[in-house]
Each structure stands twice: as structure tokens, then as C-alpha cells.
């Protein structure tokens, strides 16, 4: 556990990047980051990943097994990359719910998908991953891409995702993870703490938000730890696939 107590009555703390902050403040601080970067979020994704994020998301969709008529929940769906693709897969008899806790990101996603004409079977919901406002056993598939590391209580969020899935439903977590070799790890550290804040400054005039994002990646559970968290929450057949030498991993679990 990342939480620390400084006294019997002190508020628990958690990490915000490399800082320890009161739990009640983390969501506010994360919200400020995404309010700041929402307008140019897609551009920054392309710049920072060299377009690789599109391949990572495509592989996640292939693993999802989503088909016509399914009901899909995309948590931290932001600007709608996954939701747009799921919309086409589920077709007119299916439904996609794009959920995000951040209203700025949700607005960008809604506007973008409406402009593209692909929002007919997509519902937009402002929601907290830890307390999903949906019925039990409701979705065939739940996804969260590059969002779990920003959640304060990750274990609660994973249990919430389990609750809203139908038996046999799939959870897919796409997230930055731990590189699998030392050379890649050193290169990735240099890239993250030098280039990412610089690009953030040049493109969004916000170096600090991208410094936080780099730090948040380092504080996120590694591949095996996240797998164990999913098993502990109640998922079966939990597996993960490393991509780009473990810089990114996608975890998949099935609700019994």
C-alpha cells in the first residue's frame, strides 16, 4: 500500500507523482492536470509515443473480443479513441459508454466523436472509476486505457469494474508499465524526464503536467503486481502482454 498515516487521526496520504499528498487532494490535482492538457491531449499522445499509442490500442481492441450487440464501458475514455472503434464493432444493436471523471476530457471526447459522426450508439457519462454508477452484471467488456495510474484507490476501482461486468465479461487495462530490460529502462527514463516535460512546455505551455505524468508512470504497479491485484479482486484467467519492451502492458481478466 502507498498510503501512510502520520498519526491516529491524520488523513491517509497517497502519491501524486513523487509527492505524498492527502488522499482527498489527489483527485483534485489529477483533475487540474487533465483540465490543462485536454485540448491538445491527442496531439501530445502522437508526439510522445510517435504514434505507437494507436497500435497499443488496436491490440487491446483485438484482445477484447467485442462483437455486434455487446455493451462496452470505456473508463477514462477521454477523447474517445477506443469508444469510436468499439462503436463500430458493437453496431446499432450494441452500446458503448464513454466514462471519464474529468469534464474537460469528456467534453473534448463528445465534441470530437459528434464531429466524426460516430456517436449514435455512444453514451457519455461523468463517473468515478472507484464508484461506477452502473448496475451489477451490466457490461460485456470494460476497458481503461492509460487511466488506472491516476486513480487514488486502484483496488477499489478494479472491484468496481468487476461488479459491473456480466459473468464471463472481460476487463482490459492498458497502461504504462515497467520496461523489461535495463538498457530500455535507462533510455526511457531519460526520455520521460527530459523530453516529455519539454514537449509539454512547447505544445501545451505546461511542463509540470507532463512531469507529473512521467512520475505517475514510475509509481504505477508493475506487471506482476497489477496481475495480482486483479486476481485478488476476483478476476479469473488474468494474463498480460508486454508491448514495446514492457513500456506498455495490457492486462486481461475474466469475471467468473
Curated annotation (Swiss-Prot):
* Biological process per Gene Ontology, one example term: methylation
A Gene Ontology molecular function term for this protein is: 2-methoxy-6-polyprenyl-1,4-benzoquinol methyltransferase activity
Residues covered by region (Disordered):
1-23
Q: Which UniProt keywords apply?
A: Menaquinone biosynthesis, Methyltransferase, S-adenosyl-L-methionine, Transferase, Ubiquinone biosynthesis
Could you say which residues bind S-adenosyl-L-methionine here? 79, 100, 128-129
Q: According to its UniProt record, what is one Pfam family this protein matches?
A: Ubie_methyltran
What protein is this chain from? Ubiquinone/menaquinone biosynthesis C-methyltransferase UbiE
Q: Which organism is it from?
A: Pseudomonas putida (strain GB-1)
